Amino acid sequence: MTNLRKTHPLMKIINHSFIDLPAPSNISAWWNFGSLLGICLMIQILTGLFLAMHYTSDTMTAFSSVAHICRDVNYGWLIRNLHANGASMFFMCLFLHVGRGIYYGSYLYKETWNIGVVLLLTAMATAFVGYVLPWGQMSFWGATVITNLLSAIPYIGTTLAEWIWGGFSVDKATLTRFFAFHFILPFIITALVIVHLLFLHGTGSNNPSGINPDSDKIPFHPYYTIKDALGLMFLLLILLSLALFSPDLLGDPDNFSPANPLSTPPHIKPEWYFLFAYAILRSIPNKLGGVLALLASILILLIIPFLHTANQRSMMFRPVSQTLFWILAANLITLTWIGGQPVEQPFIIIGQLASMLYFLLILVLMPFAGLFENYMLKPKW
């Protein structure tokens, strides 16, 4: 009798994707983040579903309904804390996953990379509309500030902003539609994840050396299922530690006050995972310029495959590119810090320098480093 796993139409797909999938024998722990992101997505959808059962998307009751979830619903506090901190874990894994892709040249699988960038943008949109739902002070003012950026678009900007709001400001209509978006987007993300995997399994995984691994492949199960399980243990350890011991560590105290359109918080800032982009937005004194820089900071990922000048795919044996990569990582941490600081000196100038360095590194220095390394590798005799 043939194995059902290899013959059943549905089981066969799962088998080829997660069990008998040929994987390079040398992929490191940096390749764990794909599976961790899948698990994060499942956690977010499940906890979100249970939260949606008790949440009301009305300006009068939204804040109270979140308080009700935490106080009166069985384990509601845990579900909410897992959902809020699960988003942080999701973005932590996302950033590490993208960083891995840049370091090891995975972006040369262009289709997989482009779908990945679309996934990142969709996840950011989902997190943004989700942050508005508790209808606290930072929810309201964050929504007001970010949606207001649309009005910077010439000619159609104001009309577009009012169309998104469903009125002349962020109000009941905005909250209702943001809840609808927040509910549907994770399922769109799930569909995109399947497409992402489809393209990835068309080419096979990259590996740290960046050379073709076809001559040395091993089955995904049991080798990488057990390796991913270890990563999962670490993920759950961090997530549960956050959710159970310091659930509000990454949140903003202003969000414990109900939304009040008549009182602006002293410092309006988004969640930590958007601070780098927020710092780039604020570093340009012009509104439209800031919006364009904000978009460029993420969309720049789409042109990275075309900026690859090195003869080697991975940065594993390219010390100059490695140095620039870690400068870029430190620069992003600096931008994240600046995004959370008030708009005053010396933070303004630090933010402007860090924003400039961000684009300079990706657009100029890293491509030049690739060319320089090619030159250094040529025999000189």
From Swiss-Prot:
Annotated heme b b562 binding sites: H83, H182
Domain of life: Eukaryota
Membrane topology category: Multi-pass membrane protein
Cofactor: heme b
Record has Acetylation as a keyword: no
Gene Ontology terms: biological process: mitochondrial electron transport, ubiquinol to cytochrome c
PROSITE patterns with a match to the protein in the record: CYTB_CTER, CYTB_NTER
Cofactor binding note from Swiss-Prot or TrEMBL: Binds 2 heme b groups non-covalently.
Transmembrane segments: 33-53, 77-98, 113-133, 178-198, 226-246, 288-308, 320-340, 347-367
GO molecular function: metal ion binding; ubiquinol-cytochrome-c reductase activity
Amino acids binding a ubiquinone: H201
Signal peptide start-end: none
One Pfam family named in its UniProt record: Cytochrom_B_C
Subcellular localization: Mitochondrion inner membrane
Role, per record: Component of the ubiquinol-cytochrome c reductase complex (complex III or cytochrome b-c1 complex) that is part of the mitochondrial respiratory chain. The b-c1 complex mediates electron transfer from ubiquinol to cytochrome c. Contributes to the generation of a proton gradient across the mitochondrial membrane that is then used for ATP synthesis.
Family statement: Belongs to the cytochrome b family.
PANTHER family: CYTOCHROME B
Record note on quaternary structure: The cytochrome bc1 complex contains 11 subunits: 3 respiratory subunits (MT-CYB, CYC1 and UQCRFS1), 2 core proteins (UQCRC1 and UQCRC2) and 6 low-molecular weight proteins (UQCRH/QCR6, UQCRB/QCR7, UQCRQ/QCR8, UQCR10/QCR9, UQCR11/QCR10 and a cleavage product of UQCRFS1). This cytochrome bc1 complex then forms a dimer.
Entry protein name: Cytochrome b
